[in-house]
Amino acid sequence: LTMKIEEATVYVLSERNGGLKTEQIAEIINRRRLHVRKDGLPVSSAQVFAAVMRNSQVFAKSEGRIMLLLLM
């Protein structure tokens, strides 16, 4: 089983302090095969960006990087 792209993004960011660029997140997701598209193509940075935009309660953007929001 693979994760949803949002879950894979959370997983990747939970390991990295300071956040990552969407290109870096997509590269890690593809390398580790955390999310596999139905058509078999690699996850793109645009898909990561779209997932981040759909989940503004989870992710923050700052200085070109995506970070996890801390939920208290």
Question: Locations of the language-model features?
Answer:
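Charged low-complexity interaction tracts in eukaryotic proteins
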Residues: 2-6, 16, 20-23, 29-72
